[in-house]
C-alpha cells in the first residue's frame, strides 16, 4: 500500500510524533477520526498512489474532508522527517558519477497555465528532472518546470544543474544523460563513427585496467 517496509513506516510515524511534540489528538474538543499511525499510512498511500481523496476515505473509513485535512497536516512533516536522510544520500552520491533524465508528471490541460504540453511525450504535464546513482537509485529531483521545456533547459531551471554543478565540469565525477542534454556539460554518449567505437572501447578498457591494477 505504501511501498515501504513496516519498520520504515514505524520510524516515520515516530519522527512525525516527535515533530508534533507528542500531541496528535486534541486535548479538548472532538477527537481526530484517525490515529497518528493510520493517518501517516493514509498520507503515504496517497503520496504513492495519487488516488482520489474520496477513494482513500472509503478505504480508511473516513470522509474526504478528513483525508484532505490529514494530508495537508502530515505531508510537510513527512518531508521534514526524511530531509536529513535524503541530504546524506545526496552527499554520498556526489562522490561518483550519476545519471540524469527527465520524466513527465501528467497534469492534463489546465486553463490559464501555458507551456504544459510536451511535444516529445505528446501529453500535458510537468517536467521533473531526476538524478540517480549508477544502480538506478533515486538521489535527487529538481523543481517541476512546464512540460514544454526541453530537458537541456529544464536541467538549469529545475535547479539540478546548480546543485550538481561539479558533475558537469570536465574534471568532475560525471553526469550521464541522453542526447537531450547536449551542451549542458553532461556526458551524452558516443557521437562519433560507430566503426571507431570498438577500438576506443578496448583502449579505454586497457587504460582503466592499468589504472586499477597497475
Where in the sequence are the language-model features?
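Short, flexible segments with low predicted structural confidence
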Residues: 13, 26-29, 38-41, 64, ...
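Basic, low-complexity segments
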Residues: 1-33, 185
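Glycine-/proline-rich flexible loop or hinge segments
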Residues: 23-28, 50-57
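Short, well-ordered secondary-structure "scaffold" segments embedded in the functional core
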Residues: 55-69, 76-80, 84-214
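Glycine-rich, flexible loop segments associated with nucleotide phosphate handling
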Residues: 34-38, 171-174
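Hydrophobic face of alpha-helices
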Residues: 13, 68-71
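Short, amphipathic alpha-helical "recognition" segments used to contact nucleic acids or chromatin
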Residues: 35-50
